[in-house]
UniProtKB/Swiss-Prot annotation:
Annotated NCBIfam families: pdxA
Keyword NADP applies: yes
PANTHER family (UniProt xref): 4-HYDROXYTHREONINE-4-PHOSPHATE DEHYDROGENASE
Protein name as it appears in the record: 4-hydroxythreonine-4-phosphate dehydrogenase
Length: 329
């Protein structure tokens, strides 16, 4: 890394394990400066509950970034709306969570930060606060005015991107259009090259229907939509294999010769990845004008403040963001 970079972290739901994990991240040295967008008292109180040392130093955007020393975090303050009890949701803090996401996103857009790493949010309490919220991916897409973003989850061994994200099953077939697939595959291919340093990405593409449609006998989306798009993109030089049946794609004879899998919908691709590497996975938003990674788990309210939360996914998300920063320099 040519110079020290700043990355911004949002801990997520304040009553969940996000603050715990951020405090745990602070217990080691990092080659980047960790700027945490959060309430100061929330972090110091949670550190005290965990019995871990934590010193907060003020964010100074006009000073050169410094590698993070163990036991410290750089604080970009956002005030809670209500006091926090670990494990107990407070509706008004839904506004606080969205404020942290907005500030962190804006900081990436204006060049303050080289990457954004997000902790788990509670979508229900944000919506209960009167804020329509589908997820991080959609929030950052809208706020950054990105033309299109793609959700991808990754472990050390497997990357799975999604053609559609948080849609009811009944709506998925209609959503799989030639225009959508062109956009999604183009973004996936581009970001694998630019952010992951893969010169010629090899992508496996799932079919939509059982047995990838069985030649049109179990649905025609493969024949009508997926195959024509793949043929067009292959003619442009992309290395695409598919459409393949999702129930047989996830095995070494295919995965050993691929850099990523494109699944047609959320529950087609992610159960395999999460079974294979739950707690070690990272959620990545492709297509944004900045690097964004996230943990692959939820808020785990029942573990907040108990010292039992596993920081593994957060460490992996941060390490991957650092690698992506290096690849884009």
């Amino acid at each position: 890394m040519v110079k020290t970079q700043r990355v911004v972290i949002t801990p997520g739901e304040p009553a969940g394990i996000g603050p715990d994990l951020v405090v745990q991240l602070a217990q080691r040295e990092w080659p980047v400066e960790l700027v945490v967008c959060a309430d100061a008292t929330l972090l110091t109180d949670r550190a005290a509950m965990l019995g871990l040392p934590l010193t907060l130093r003020p964010y100074s955007p006009n000073s050169p970034a410094q590698p993070q020393t163990a036991g410290t975090l750089t604080l970009l303050p956002v005030a809670l709306r209500e006091s926090v009890t670990a494990g107990q949701l407070a509706i008004e803090n839904g506004h606080y969570v969205v404020e942290t996401l907005a500030r962190a996103c804006d900081g990436c857009l204006n060049g303050e930060f080289a990457a954004l790493i997000t902790g788990p949010v509670h979508k229900g309490v944000i919506n209960d606060a009167g804020i329509p919220f589908t997820g991080h991916t959609e929030f950052f897409e809208e706020r950054s005015q990105a033309k299109k973003v793609v959700m991808m989850l990754a472990t050390e061994e497997l990357r799975v991107a999604l053609a559609t994200t948080h849609l009811p099953l009944r709506d998925i077939a209609d959503a799989i259009t030639p225009a959508l697939l062109h956009e999604v595959i183009a973004i996936l291919h581009h970001d694998l090259r630019t952010k992951f340093g893969i010169a010629e990405p090899r992508i496996l593409v799932c079919g939509l229907n059982p047995h990838a449609g069985e030649g049109g006998h179990m649905g025609t989306e493969e024949i009508d939509t997926i195959i024509p798009v793949l043929n067009e993109l292959r003619a442009q030089g992309m290395k695409l294999n598919g459409p393949l049946p999702a129930d047989t794609l996830f095995q070494p004879k295919y995965l050993d010769n691929a850099d990523a899998v494109l699944a047609m919908y959320h529950d087609q691709g992610l159960p395999v990845l999460k079974y294979q590497g739950f707690g070690r996975g990272v959620n990545i938003t492709l297509g944004l004008p900045f690097i964004r990674t996230s943990v692959d788990h939820g808020t785990a309210l029942e573990l907040a403040g108990r010292g039992e939360a596993d920081v593994g996914s957060f460490i992996t998300a941060l390490n991957l963001a650092i690698k992506m920063i290096v690849n884009t320099q």
